[in-house]
Structures are given as structure tokens and as C-alpha cells.
């Protein structure tokens, strides 16, 4: 069994911060822990907009705290996000995530992340079996 504490994990390399300062993510469970998914607590900071397009990963996102919206770029549809809401990127949806109040999100990825991924310029992460040599955001 593996037991981790969020605040303790934030003091380690499990805390990944976007180069542009829009978000940080504490990777509590990673691919190396076994299983086929990873689990993260991510903060999207107030007043930011982040372009995301997980071409190689399925993601489910549950809002714990804060407020914002997610916009799918294919159709321009906007969904408000508040505590208690979940959005599921079941079609690898390219989207914009905006926070009107800092959002605390519980995120599950499959396949699981290794922990060192950063968003590429196109908003994606590298496939699980590919080295990530593209420039990060």
C-alpha cells in the first residue's frame, strides 16, 4: 500500500509548476506506482487561461474548490465549472480552461503520467511511450 500526504508531496518534485505560472499540479499517484492511471491535485490560478489538448491521454477532472469555465475549441461551447462538477475529456477535446477564482481540481489521467510531463506548445503531453523533446509552454 502507498500512502501520501498532499502538503508533504508539495514539498517534493511531485509538485510541477507551469512555466507560464498559470497552474501547478501535485502528482500524488504516478505510472510508476502501478495501475493504469495517475491522480493529481491541480490548482488553476485566478485570472488565467490555459490551452490544453490531451491527444494521448484520457482525463477526468473534479472541481473541489474555486470557479471557472471550460471551452471546447471544436464548437466554442462553454461550460461553467464550480465545486462538485466533473468534466470528462472523453474525446481528447482541445479546450481552454479559465479560472475566475483559483480552482482546486482532482484529476485522473490514463495512461498514467510519469510526473515530469509539461504541456507542449500545442497543449498536449507526449504519449506515455515517447520521450518529450518539444518545447514546453
UniProtKB/Swiss-Prot annotation:
PANTHER family: L-ECTOINE SYNTHASE, PTHR39289. This is L-ectoine synthase. Optimum pH is 8.5-9.0. One of its GO terms (molecular function) is ectoine synthase activity. Residues 118-137 are annotated as: Disordered. Belongs to the ectoine synthase family. The gene is ectC. GO terms for biological process: ectoine biosynthetic process. Its EC number is 4.2.1.108. Pfam families: Ectoine_synth. CDD domains: cupin_EctC (cd06978). It comes from Halomonas elongata (strain ATCC 33173 / DSM 2581 / NBRC 15536 / NCIMB 2198 / 1H9). Seems to require potassium ions for its activity and stability. Slightly inhibited by N-ethylmaleimide. Optimum temperature is 0-10 degrees Celsius in the presence of 0.05 M NaCl, 15 degrees Celsius in the presence of 0.77 M NaCl, and 30 degrees Celsius in the presence of 3.0 M NaCl. HAMAP family: Ectoine_synth. InterPro entries: Ectoine_synth, RmlC-like_jellyroll, RmlC_Cupin_sf. Pathway: Amine and polyamine biosynthesis; ectoine biosynthesis; L-ectoine from L-aspartate 4-semialdehyde: step 3/3. It catalyses: (2S)-4-acetamido-2-aminobutanoate = L-ectoine + H2O. It comes from the Bacteria. SUPFAM superfamilies: RmlC-like cupins. Catalyzes the circularization of gamma-N-acetyl-alpha,gamma-diaminobutyric acid (ADABA) to ectoine (1,4,5,6-tetrahydro-2-methyl-4-pyrimidine carboxylic acid), which is an excellent osmoprotectant. Does not act on N-acetylated amino acids like N-alpha-acetyl-L-asparagine,N-alpha-acetyl-L-ornithine, N-alpha-acetyl-L-lysine and N-epsilon-acetyl-L-lysine.
